[in-house]
Amino acid sequence: MAKQEGWLRCKPLVYRPHPGRRHAAAAMTVLYMASALVVPDSGVSAWLVLAADAAVLDRLAEWFIGQPAFKTEVAMLALGNAFAGAGFLVLGATRLGLDLPPVAGPHMLSVGALGCAVMAVLIIAGLRHTGRDLLDLRWQAHGAALLMAAAAFVRVLPEIAFASGLAPLLWSLPTGR
């Protein structure tokens, strides 16, 4: 348990997933990946990816609540999990025949889930490895997290023919290139 100080005074941060479901998301994801490799065109992999979606969203339902959920690094981790759930849902629906772009699910998983999770880890590790507290988060980190989240949202929109030129701009702004 970590205790928050400063402008965000609240109860100790506690995240306790239900013991029986602690590894369900990872297990269902591994089962889906194995079935997608062995029987890629089978309906089994479609149903397993939907089971992985349910497990990821179940884990997200037990996320931090209250004021700690509004901290940038916690919100980015939650958004990454939300993108993972949405990506698995779209991937499963596409495999079951729903008329969705086939790249929308993988883009939600890669750009959304992975991008937001990596940004959160960079924020946390960057502060911890330089000996600073998480309350010492500068405006640049908040801005980079916001741009990463916006880029993840905008990356999926071109699949539905909207805002196709905005994604590269938002992806380049956090790095300054």
Q: Language-model segments: what does each one mean?
A:
Residues 1-177:
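Hydrophobic alpha-helical transmembrane segments of multi-pass integral membrane proteins
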